[in-house]
């Protein structure tokens, strides 16, 4: 990559990182700290955790299409402002209903597809795989860091402090886009990143893609469900204070990542990804069931979470790649 491409990739990966940190720092502590919100119930707390995904799913494609008309950076600015506004709304209230509204507003800044399209505009075709890989690694690292930072910030500043930090990260992302991201002279029409209206029906009727889409949906559903109950287990069953959760998650995420990598390497080199993925699904199922039997043993809880994230990280890294391989070349953006 040339200097301009390196700067663009670094800047856009940083924007991704800021957004991912903001969205997921709240995940490991929300069920614990959210109990003090007015009107809070377990169901409403769970909805608040996942509410951003609803608006994000609905607005992802419209944001991408609008960026073709009004410009990439303009839509990114709008998305980040919405993200910051949602964070401030959630930070400034003690009502669960307003927090839910804030989370929905956070998700409304659905700029992921626009960022990918801008990355495509600013990189040559032969360098795009490296650029996408860099962003993918950044997303994975940001998620892991968010699980460590969330409990620390929650112990220091509470739930509002996490949301205020998220708003600050959005402002930093705005500065990065303004100062470091070049403005493309023209949009490149790339099948890898640009949604096509005429391809939508074809993609939605493809059974193989639908199975993979459902796999990603189920994977993130299980992850969200885990954090509805696991933080409370650490606190109530094992007496681990919220301020101490960070080292538990850090040790699990680091070790599970290194344990997962050899399986991806073997699967790709030997062209045995299907058995590897089936094994990961089986391990994820067993680990999820294993949470019912860890009562009273922190070591057992650590081991089960280790296997859970070993399987989760493997699937998280592989399923999007499989979708890219299965999708027709003309409809990968869709």
Locate predicted features.
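Cytoplasmic helix-loop-helix junction between adjacent transmembrane helices
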Residues: 102-140
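C-terminal membrane-cytosol helix-exit motif in multi-pass small-molecule transporters
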Residues: 168-187
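Conserved MFS/SLC helix-loop-helix module at the cytosolic interface between two early adjacent transmembrane helices
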Residues: 58-94
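Helix-to-loop junctions at the C-terminal end of transmembrane segments
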Residues: 60-71, 258-272
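Cytoplasmic membrane-interface "Motif A"-like loop-to-helix N-cap segments
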Residues: 69-79, 268-281
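Juxtamembrane intracellular "pre-TM" segments in multi-pass secondary transporters
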Residues: 1-5, 182-215
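Short amphipathic helix-loop junctions that connect adjacent transmembrane helices
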Residues: 28-42, 228-244
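C-terminal transmembrane helical hairpin of 12-TM major facilitator-type secondary transporters
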Residues: 274-319
